[in-house]
Amino acid sequence: MGFQKFSPFLALSILVLLQAGSLHAAPFRSALESSPADPATLSEDEARLLLAALVQDYVQMKASELEQEQEREGSSLDSPRSKRCGNLSTCMLGTYTQDFNKFHTFPQTAIGVGAPGKKRDMSSDLERDHRPHVSMPQNAN
């Protein structure tokens, strides 16, 4: 159970310690003190195999977590909508219909052609625009 929660930091630190132990110019113990049958020492090939196994287990663990997360998302309350919206045009049509209904339920505003307020007579506007302006001098002829 604890191996499933194995953090990548711990795997990386094991790798660093193994590599640091094999890269020292002067070993911690002399060659005479260490026996070749010492069970605590790993050969370079064994260290690589151990690291490969750790990485493979970590990748499998993350993949299974991702699958579980996707299964949880698939069983959420949004799944009927995703089943309904298998066709993009159906989804877009439904969304536009909802927006259109919202637009028609807004309260009416007093803006536009039929809005109450000051009404101007178009004929008087045209006459006023065609009369000479006060600041312009008129012809004496």
Curated annotation (Swiss-Prot):
It is found in: Secreted. The keyword Disulfide bond applies. The keyword Translocase does not apply. Disulfide bonds join C85-C91. Residues 118-132 have a biased composition (Basic and acidic residues). GO terms for molecular function: calcitonin receptor binding; hormone activity; identical protein binding. This is Calcitonin. Keywords: Amidation, Cleavage on pair of basic residues, Disulfide bond, Hormone, Phosphoprotein, Secreted, Signal. It comes from Homo sapiens (Human). Its main location: secreted. It holds the Pfam family Calc_CGRP_IAPP. It comes from the Eukaryota. The modification Phosphoserine is found at S43. One of its GO terms (cellular component) is neuronal dense core vesicle. The CALCA gene (HGNC:1437) encodes a small family of peptides including calcitonin (UniProtKB:P01258), its C-terminal flanking peptide katacalcin (UniProtKB:P01258) and the calcitonin gene-related peptide/CGRP1 (UniProtKB:P06881).
